[in-house]
Every structure is written in structure tokens, then in C-alpha cells.
């Protein structure tokens, strides 16, 4: 197994190197939590300094509220500003249940509380809310009022049992959707956490669930998300899709593998008449694959589904399903984003069923007769208009579903490869939200990716018909003070806001902060943020309906040469010359930090008005991310250094450093005295005076020497009484005279 795992790791590294390059991409801008607060573009809300495990469970853009569940609290926050007018309900578990929970050996802090895990809109005035209830789930109706201005938020009913609606264990995911005042949940239905089910409750009809203790249906699932998706024009054909991962035993029966899955059911399923009574008769599932293919055809999987986001369109069949996947390997840490066409998912569910056959129980396509109506078809829909309920399904249809719930073909992503891969990083992706943005040169998708380190990456994905490569990390935001993992994330394209939660609180950030990219047109253009454009004065929000003549944006190429003419581009590409000194045989550092980590740096050296030549790097001359380190400085190192940054084929000079080398002997004499200028009195005893130094060193050079002497004496040297200058005075005089003669040769002749 270890050999196979290592082979998988090498396969991913080979794939990643060939497709994306060897280095991991970096964000153009990184903002810490404090820096984000200083921009005054974010809001943060919490009700306690203690972590309360916040989860954003419902966003209602019609009432301008987002609803958050946490330990013992239900929160209603203003969608425009979560810090303004927050409403909360304190809803703890009963004291008896908390005590029973502790006596059962459950965690008093992270288990024996009422962790709110279900908030669904029941009708226009009420929410239906469920919590873990200290391992005894409970549910209530909450009155939120008809309009948000009413500021109504209160529990409006007695507690009722939440069994079959919310998991007992708050650390086990519960997913749910509400349709016509009926609740559909994916959770564990028992105290011990052994009976997983997809359950319909809160219904005037009979309750329905998955077949109990049938590993063909569910095998130790961890539920991730649930969505209602139309299937054609007939509303009776709509399906509820449940996304989860489960542990499956391999054919040998000895090893359990994790597979990511999609299951679907018909909301109007009422179970079978004689078989599968009060069980789903339309339950089907298929494997969801996110993998990379090695050169030898070996497939390596990102097998653990973490989150799902549906990017809807006017046509439901063109809906895109984005998924976050991570590796289950203990050898390395990796995550990926895969994207699926809904039409491809539906094609798999309309394809062959899986069937186990032979002594090794290998999966093969089912070759027998498929009963009518096709298993998985909803009653009363386009294909079964005369069947009002699943109880009218023939027995062979129900029996087939019980024994063949799995589809043979897996569901592959677009192009059969991940959109984004991260390996060898100190983080994993945990959550995803996606926005569709109209830029000046086309439509693109912007991904907001939450990590287990409490940050959010903003990534733009360029369409494949663009000449540029697929992804760019525009920003990385530290949305929480601690490194607590992102637990939920909601996006509002209407409000242009992103809402993020972790165990410590909820943060709201806008989808764009255009001014952080810089104050020049080139900075704005190089950022390639589809939300932003240069308006002639600053980098600001881009509106596709505005006048394009005055808006400069180039997401496709990010080329300032074509977009920023007339905006002081020549001055921007140059840098003012500075002077820096180094001492022979010592180490010096020429500082040059690029504005973007996505830029590459090249150092050029120009000597005595000669042509610029690229600096040859060696063990003595080392390029770092912050500049150029020169060890054991030599006379040959003097000259004019140019630090050139290249980003997206756009070159600019970040620094011009006129590097001058001081003679070691001269500095040694000068650093011998306590006062930086007392050496002059000793020099007066010779045949020359301090004025002789005017020709040897310029005013700036003397200032540099003075500072160097001061710094040298502060490095732990013991203070000494002034004494006569030691050393060979004749050697010092010869050194100064030679320096004066060199300077005279470089001076212009008198006119």
C-alpha cells in the first residue's frame, strides 16, 4: 500500500509540474486580518470571545438577512452590514440533557451543547430551526416577521424532537433542504452514530428514508451538501441531489476506500406498496471522480469531497457544479477543484446500472432487462404522467432499485481533470463560492476558496479560448485572527459581498478591493481583476455598462502597454537612482522587492556608461525574494545596478542603485576611534589637513562613512578612551592621494 501511495504522489507531482509548473502560485495581494480591518471594507461579528462554532445556514436576500447557527444561539444578521442591528436568540440545551450528555462521556465543550445545524425557511414569516440538543436533537419554529424592518426574531413554538432531522453529534454534518414545508435531511438518526439516513420529515404524508443498514445504499457516509435541481420543464421531475463521501469495502473485503458520491431522490416519492415501504423507491447514486492521470494511465484520486457550489444559469442543464476535493493519503496534503456539467451528471444517471458478478464481485454494466418505468423516474412527470405516486410502481421496479442503486459509470469533471490543484502547501481548501463576472473582454468565473488556515483565496478562472493560462490568485485574505478553518461560506452577487464563518465568528468582505492593487494604471491592469478597472484617476469598480473609452481593463492579457498609454506609463516604468555603499570583503544587500509575487526579477549591472549586462549569480552573489545579496564585496562589484521586474511580459525598473565600494583599509582606520571625526586630529599631525579629503570623498560619501563608523562601534564594542591613531600614516596618506587622483580623472575638465 505504501508503494502505491508513493506512486500516486509522484504521479500528481509529475502531472502538476507538466501542467502548472513546478512552483505553487501565489496571491498578488495578501492582507492580514488587521490589514483587512484597516481597509475598512470588512465587518466582523461574534457574540462571545469563546469559540461557538458559527455556521451560516441560510441567506435570505429578499429580507436582507443571513441566519447563523452556533452553540446555544440562533443569529439573524443584516446582510448589508453584519455588525449593524444583529438579532439573537439564546437557545441552550436543557440542563438535564447536558448532564446526561456528560455522563455518557461526551465532550462537555464541543458536544454537550445545543449546536444549531438546521435553519430552513418554512414560510414567509417563520424559520424551522434544529439543534443537536446535547446529543438529543430538538427543533423549533422561529418567528422572523414578514419584513426585516419589523425587527422580530423569537421562538414561536415548543421544542419538538429533532430525530430524523438533525444529527445527534454536532461534529457529524447535517445537510437539509425544505420543499413545500417538508424537510429533507441527510444525517445520522441515532445516538451512537451508526444509522445514516436521507430522511423526509415534517410532512403531512408518510415519513420516508433510505433502506436501513443496507451498505449498497449508504456506507458510513459523511454528508456534504444538498440541492434541489429541476430536470426538464415538468416540476414533478425535479430531483434532490445529496453530495457525500462514504467508506466502501473493496472486493477483497479487507480494505475500506473513500469515494465521493452523488445520490438523488424524487421529492414526491412516498415509498413502495409491498417492498421498500416508507423507503425511497427512486434512490440512485453515482461516484463523483476528481483525479489526475499519470503518463502510464494510472489514475490518482482526490477522493474526499469537502464542499459543493452550484453556479446556476437560465438553463438548468447548463448549471455548473464546483466541488472541493482533498486527499485521504497520510503521505502528503493536497486539494483540488473539479467542475462538472449538470448535463454530464444527468447523463450518468440515465446510463447503465452497476451489477456485481463473478467470484470477485466485480462491477459490470447490468445486461438484463430494465423494468418500466425506468428506475429512478419520478411519478407524475413527463415520462410517467399516469402514475400519481410511487406506490403504483410495479414490484420489479422497486426490487431493482433495492438491489441496483449504483450507476456503473462514474461522473468525470470537465476535460476529465481538475481545474485547480494544490499539493505541497501548508493549507487545504475547505469551502467554495463562485461568482460569474462580465469583464471588458468576456465573461469569467471568480472562485472564492476557503482554507483550513482561516484564509480566503480569490481566484479568477480564464475561459479556455483565452490565450492566458487558466487561473490567477488575485488576493488572499486572512478573514479571522486565528487560523481556525473556514466552516461555511455564502456569496451574494446581488450585494457583491462574501460571508464567511469559522468557530470564532462571522466575517463579511466585499468581492472587490480595487484600490489595494496600487495607485497607477499599470498596477490596476497587471492585477487582472475582472471587478476592477482604471478610471483615469484610480483603480475602481468596473461596470460593463459604463463608457469603455474611459475604463481600462485587460483580464485576458494584463498588458499595461496597450491599456495605460497617456497615464504617465514611462515615468512608472523607471525608478529614481539611489546611492549605496559597501565595504570591500564585507557583505552588502541591495534591496528590491517586487510589487507582486507573480513578477520575476532580473538584475542588470552597468559600468562606466557601458551596456547593461545581466548579473551572474553565484555562491557569492545570491538573488533573494527581497533583493541581491553580495558576499565578500570586490572592486569589480561597483556600478549601477538595475532591478527589472517582469510580469505578464511587462517590464519595469523597480530600483536603480549606484553601488560604490569603500576601501577596507580606509574604513579600518576610521572605525578605530570612538568619535567618527576624531581621526581628523591625528591626520593634522601629518603633512595634510582634513580639507584634503574634499577631493577624496563627496559629501554623501562622508555621510555614509560617518554612519558606517557609528554602526560599527555599536556592535558590542567596548568603549575606549581616545588615543592616538594607530597604523601606518604613510600608507593612509598614499591611500587618500590615490583616491583623490581617481576622482580627478572622473571629473569633467574646467571650462
Swiss-Prot record:
Designated name of the protein: Semaphorin-3C
Gene3D superfamilies the record matches: Immunoglobulins, ligand-binding face of the semaphorins, domain 2, YVTN repeat-like/Quinoprotein amine dehydrogenase
Superkingdom assignment: Eukaryota
Pfam families assigned: Sema
Gene this protein is translated from: SEMA3C
Glycan-modified residues: 81, 123, 268, 465, 585-586
Expression tissues: Collapsin-1, -2, -3, and -5 bind to overlapping but distinct axon tracts.
Composition-biased stretches (Basic and acidic residues): 712-731
Residue ranges annotated for the Ig-like C2-type domain, each copy included: 571-655
PANTHER family: SEMAPHORIN, SEMAPHORIN-3C
CDD domains according to UniProt: Ig_Sema3, Sema_3C
Description of its domains: Strong binding to neuropilin is mediated by the carboxy third of the protein.
Amino acid at each position: 500500500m505504501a508503494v502505491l501511495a508513493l506512486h500516486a504522489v509522484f504521479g500528481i507531482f509529475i502531472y502538476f509540474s507538466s501542467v502548472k509548473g513546478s512552483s505553487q502560485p501565489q496571491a498578488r495581494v495578501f492582507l492580514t486580518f488587521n490589514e483587512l480591518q484597516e481597509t475598512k471594507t470588512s465587518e466582523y461579528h461574534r457574540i462571545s470571545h469563546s469559540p461557538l462554532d458559527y455556521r451560516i445556514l441560510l441567506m435570505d436576500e429578499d429580507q436582507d438577512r443571513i441566519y447563523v447557527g452556533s452553540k446555544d444561539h440562533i443569529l439573524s444578521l443584516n446582510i448589508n452590514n453584519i455588525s449593524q442591528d444583529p438579532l439573537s436568540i439564546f437557545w441552550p440545551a436543557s440542563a438535564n440533557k447536558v448532564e446526561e450528555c456528560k455522563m455518557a462521556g461526551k465532550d462537555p465543550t464541543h458536544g454537550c451543547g445545543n449546536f444549531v445545524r438546521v435553519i430552513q425557511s418554512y414560510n414567509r414569516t417563520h424559520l424551522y430551526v434544529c439543534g443537536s440538543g446535547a446529543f438529543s436533537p430538538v427543533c423549533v419554529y422561529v418567528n422572523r416577521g414578514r419584513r426585516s424592518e419589523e425587527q422580530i426574531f423569537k421562538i414561536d413554538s415548543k421544542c419538538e424532537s429533532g430525530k430524523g432531522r438533525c444529527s445527534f453529534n454536532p461534529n457529524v454534518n447535517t445537510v437539509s433542504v425544505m420543499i413545500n414545508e417538508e424537510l429533507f435531511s441527510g444525517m445520522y438518526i441515532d445516538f451512537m452514530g451508526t444509522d445514516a439516513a436521507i430522511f423526509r420529515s415534517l410532512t403531512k404524508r408518510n415519513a420516508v428514508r433510505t433502506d436501513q443498514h443496507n451498505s449498497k445504499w449508504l456506507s458510513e457516509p459523511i454528508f456534504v451538501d444538498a440541492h434541489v435541481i429541476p430536470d426538464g420543464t415538468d416540476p414533478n421531475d425535479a430531483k434532490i441531489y445529496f453530495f457525500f463521501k462514504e467508506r466502501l469495502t473493496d472486493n477483497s473485503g479487507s480494505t475500506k476506500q473513500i469515494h465521493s458520491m452523488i445520490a438523488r431522490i424524487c421529492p414526491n416519492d412516498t415509498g413502495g406498496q409491498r417492498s421498500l415501504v416508507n423507503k425511497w423507491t427512486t434512490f440512485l447514486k453515482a461516484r463523483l471522480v476528481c483525479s489526475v492521470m499519470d503518463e502510464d494511465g494510472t489514475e490518482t484520486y482526490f477522493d474526499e469531497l469537502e464542499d459543493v457550489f452550484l453556479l446556476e444559469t437560465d438553463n438548468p442543464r447548463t448549471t455548473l457544479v464546483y466541488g472541493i476535493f482533498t486527499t485521504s493519503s497520510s503521505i502528503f496534503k493536497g486539494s483540488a477543484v473539479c467542475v462538472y456539467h449538470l448535463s454530464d451528471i444527468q447523463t450518468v444517471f440515465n446510463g447503465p446500472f452497476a451489477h456485481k458478478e463473478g467470484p470477485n464481485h466485480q462491477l459490470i454494466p447490468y445486461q438484463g432487462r430494465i423494468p418500466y418505468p425506468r428506475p429512478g423516474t419520478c411519478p407524475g412527470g413527463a415520462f410517467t404522467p399516469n402514475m400519481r405516486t410511487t406506490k403504483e410502481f410495479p414490484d420489479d421496479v422497486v426490487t431493482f432499485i433495492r438491489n441496483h442503486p449504483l450507476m456503473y459509470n462514474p461522473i468525470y469533471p470537465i476535460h476529465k481533470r481538475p481545474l485547480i490543484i494544490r499539493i505541497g502547501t501548508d493549507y487545504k481548501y475547505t469551502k467554495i463560492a463562485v461568482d460569474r463576472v462580465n469583464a471588458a473582454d468576456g465573461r469569467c468565473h471568480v472562485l472564492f476558496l476557503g482554507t483550513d488556515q482561516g484564509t480566503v483565496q480569490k481566484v479568477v478562472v480564464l475561459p479556455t479560448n483565452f490565450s492566458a493560462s487558466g487561473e490567477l490568485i488575485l488576493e488572499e485574505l486572512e478573514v479571522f485572527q486565528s487560523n481556525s478553518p473556514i466552516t461555511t461560506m455564502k456569496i451574494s452577487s446581488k450585494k457583491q459581498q462574501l460571508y464567511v464563518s469559522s468557530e470564532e465568528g462571522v466575517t463579511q468582505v466585499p468581492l472587490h478591493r480595487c484600490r489595494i492593487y496600487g495607485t497607477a494604471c499599470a498596477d490596476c491592469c497587471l492585477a487582472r481583476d475582472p471587478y476592477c478597472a482604471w478610471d483615469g484617476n484610480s483603480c475602481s469598480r468596473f461596470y460593463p455598462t459604463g463608457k469603455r473609452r474611459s475604463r481600462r481593463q485587460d483580464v485576458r492579457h494584463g498588458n499595461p502597454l496597450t491599456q495605460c498609454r497617456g497615464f504617465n506609463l514611462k515615468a512608472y516604468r523607471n525608478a529614481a537612482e539611489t546611492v549605496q555603499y559597501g565595504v570591500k570583503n564585507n557583505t552588502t544587500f541591495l534591496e528590491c522587492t517586487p510589487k507582486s509575487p507573480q513578477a520575476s526579477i532580473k538584475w542588470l549591472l552597468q559600468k562606466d556608461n557601458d551596456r547593461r549586462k545581466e548579473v551572474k549569480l553565484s555562491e557569492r552573489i545570491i538573488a533573494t525574494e527581497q533583493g541581491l545579496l553580495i558576499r565578500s564585496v570586490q572592486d569589480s562589484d561597483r556600478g549601477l545596478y538595475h532591478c527589472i521586474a517582469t510580469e505578464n511580459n511587462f517590464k519595469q525598473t523597480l530600483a536603480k542603485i549606484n553601488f560604490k565600494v569603500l576601501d577596507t583599509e580606509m574604513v579600518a582606520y576610521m572605525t578605530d576611534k570612538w568619535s567618527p571625526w576624531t581621526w581628523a586630529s591625528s591626520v593634522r599631525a601629518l603633512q595634510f589637513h582634513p580639507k584634503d579629503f574634499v577631493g577624496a570623498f563627496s559629501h554623501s560619501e562622508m555621510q555614509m562613512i560617518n554612519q558606517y563608523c557609528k554602526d560599527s562601534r555599536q556592535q558590542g564594542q567596548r568603549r575606549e578612551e581616545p588615543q592616538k591613531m594607530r597604523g601606518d600614516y604613510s600608507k593612509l596618506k598614499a591611500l587618500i592621494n590615490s583616491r583623490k587622483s581617481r576622482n580627478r580623472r572622473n571629473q569633467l575638465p574646467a571650462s
